[in-house]
Amino acid sequence: MRRITVLGATGSIGQNTLNVVSRHPDDFQVFALTAHSQISAMAELCVKHNPQYAVMGSYNAAAELKALLGQQTSTQVMYGDQALAEVSSDAEVDVVMAAIVGAAGLSPTLAAIDAGKDVLLANKEALVMSGQLFIDHAQRSGARIIPVDSEHNAIFQCLPQAAQQQVGTMALAEHGIQYLLLTGSGGPFRDIPLEELPQQTPGAACNHPNWSMGRKISVDSATMLNKGLEYIEARWLFNCSRDQLKVVIHPQSVIHSMVQYTDGSVLAQMGEPDMRTPIAHSLGYPERLESGVAGLDFTQIAELTFKQPEAQRYPCLQLAIEACWEGQWATTALNAANEVAVAAFLQEQVGFTDIAKVCDSVLQSIQADEADSLETLLAIDKQARLAANKWLQEYAQ
């Protein structure tokens, strides 16, 4: 019986994780669930899974949850950053699903890493912001990182077993690997005329053709900044050089990523676009767990197509690739600027193509040395958010 903490339990990844966990009651026990402010959704999860602890983002949210639960469960309700760190690092916890969206997920995920847990990494921003620092912490503590993002999980599955034991430190060439190929659908706007991009609405951006995701990640998919963040994450997870990492658009989302070997072989992980598959893989690794996902019916796949992403259509992707090799300060600043810009777009304060403009402006304005501590990274994050908000204020005038 393995005890699990789910960070970001009310989100898409969190709920899919609990869906898989509930299929294996003899293998998993829910130790703690966390959420920011989704009180009613959290109450339902607490009643269903009866965690030992539930953590909310604020005192008021915790008080409301406690009142709503009443005597229905024995769950102890807590709130705040310290409580997040505690349920991530508690001695009773075996596995932590790191699924808090955004920079807010970094600190509790690092707490789990420092405590030597098995960390199922679904939070892109942890590696985007902290990169080498994150990997160094895992090396020191002996924590095991298993990627959950469909693309990184796909690559992980296609690696030799020896490389799977060296997340963050592997030498790809020593394992006969030429390069890694990240696939992306291209989002809902991949085929519309470029001149129509500025008019696209939040509703259209969130209408992903293949995947069911949260609103923020759906917008990131539309700009392909999501793929840019995954590119940065892959650089750190698999210790890539620039020529060992490529991105290709694959509209059908059947192949989730590929590994090109030096002998000419290509290994690809395929499956239905359902996050329960990589979640089940990460939960069960190295064994396989039933996930509830139907197998692929190859007779129903009409075609598998691929193309290069257009720089004009996806400027956010290009910004992310350049930031990846510029330094940790750049990826941290880009992530922060994007979070601010996407939030403004979802509130219809800026247009779709303004997201890239905000990100580019912030990267141009920030002067930073290499980030070598969590405090420095958080300071850069704050500086970038201030710069992004300044851009938005000037835009509104």
UniProtKB/Swiss-Prot annotation:
Q: Does the keyword Chaperone apply?
A: no
Which residues are listed for 1-deoxy-D-xylulose 5-phosphate binding in this entry? 124, 150-151, 185, 208, 221, 226-227, 230
**Pathway field:** Isoprenoid biosynthesis; isopentenyl diphosphate biosynthesis via DXP pathway; isopentenyl diphosphate from 1-deoxy-D-xylulose 5-phosphate: step 1/6
Query: What Gene Ontology terms describe what this protein does at the molecular function level?
Result: 1-deoxy-D-xylulose-5-phosphate reductoisomerase activity; manganese ion binding; NADPH binding
Q: Which cofactor does it need?
A: Mg(2+); Mn(2+)
Q: Which EC number(s) does UniProt give?
A: 1.1.1.267
Q: Which reaction does it catalyse?
A: 2-C-methyl-D-erythritol 4-phosphate + NADP(+) = 1-deoxy-D-xylulose 5-phosphate + NADPH + H(+)
The protein's UniProt keywords, in alphabetical order, are: Isoprene biosynthesis, Manganese, Metal-binding, NADP, Oxidoreductase
Where does this protein hold Mn(2+)?
Answer: 149, 151, 230
Q: Which N-terminal residues, if any, form the signal peptide? A: none
Asked whether the keyword Transmembrane is assigned, the reply is no
Q: Which domain of life is it from?
A: Bacteria
Name the residues that bind NADPH: 10-13, 38, 123, 125, 214
Cited Pfam families: DXP_redisom_C (PF08436), DXP_reductoisom (PF02670), DXPR_C (PF13288)
- Transmembrane stretches in the record are none
Instruction: Spell out the family assignment given in the record's similarity comment.
Output: Belongs to the DXR family.
Record's function text: Catalyzes the NADPH-dependent rearrangement and reduction of 1-deoxy-D-xylulose-5-phosphate (DXP) to 2-C-methyl-D-erythritol 4-phosphate (MEP).
- List the protein's name: 1-deoxy-D-xylulose 5-phosphate reductoisomerase
Q: Identify the coding gene.
A: dxr
